């Protein structure tokens, strides 16, 4: 199937299902089951319930889709403590 035939929708992840699948409520009102695209898996992009996503669907099966993009949050990040990483221990490497 050519890429030109795929349809893109935006929606909200409502539920995380087994086997790396998600239930997504589309802006159009439909609810579908979607899986994570390979590029999102490769780049370790995590998707949680409540995330805004872009879904790619085939015009032949409008019940299934593929998550191709997770939109960044509009809410400001909160500082919950000291920065993570090696800065608080004085270096990047662990002593033996």
Swiss-Prot record:
Renumbered residue ranges of the record's region Disordered = 71-96
Pfam families hit by this protein: eIF-1a
Alphabetized InterPro entries for the sequence: NA-bd_OB-fold, RNA-binding_domain_S1_IF1, S1_domain, TIF_IF1
Q: Cytoplasm: is it a keyword of this entry? A: yes
Keywords for this entry? Cytoplasm, Initiation factor, Protein biosynthesis, RNA-binding, rRNA-binding
Q: Where in the cell is it found?
A: Cytoplasm
State the Gene Ontology terms under molecular function: ribosome binding; rRNA binding; translation initiation factor activity
S1-like domain location is 1-72
Chief subcellular site?
cytoplasm
Q: Name one GO cellular component term.
A: cytosol
State whether it acts alone or in a complex, and with which partners, per the record: Component of the 30S ribosomal translation pre-initiation complex which assembles on the 30S ribosome in the order IF-2 and IF-3, IF-1 and N-formylmethionyl-tRNA(fMet); mRNA recruitment can occur at any time during PIC assembly.
Q: What family is this protein classified in?
A: Belongs to the IF-1 family.
Role: One of the essential components for the initiation of protein synthesis. Stabilizes the binding of IF-2 and IF-3 on the 30S subunit to which N-formylmethionyl-tRNA(fMet) subsequently binds. Helps modulate mRNA selection, yielding the 30S pre-initiation complex (PIC). Upon addition of the 50S ribosomal subunit IF-1, IF-2 and IF-3 are released leaving the mature 70S translation initiation complex.
**Can you name this protein?**
Translation initiation factor IF-1
């Amino acid at each position: 199937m050519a890429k030109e035939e795929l349809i893109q929708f935006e929606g909200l992840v409502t539920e995380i299902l087994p086997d790396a699948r998600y239930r997504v409520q589309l802006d159009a009102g439909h609810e579908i089951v979607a899986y994570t695209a390979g590029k999102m898996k490769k780049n370790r992009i995590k998707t949680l319930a409540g995330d805004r996503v872009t879904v790619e669907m085939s015009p032949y099966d409008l019940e299934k889709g593929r998550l191709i993009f997770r939109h960044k949050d509009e809410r400001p990040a909160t500082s919950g403590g000291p920065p993570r990483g090696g800065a608080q221990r004085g270096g990047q490497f662990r002593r033996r």
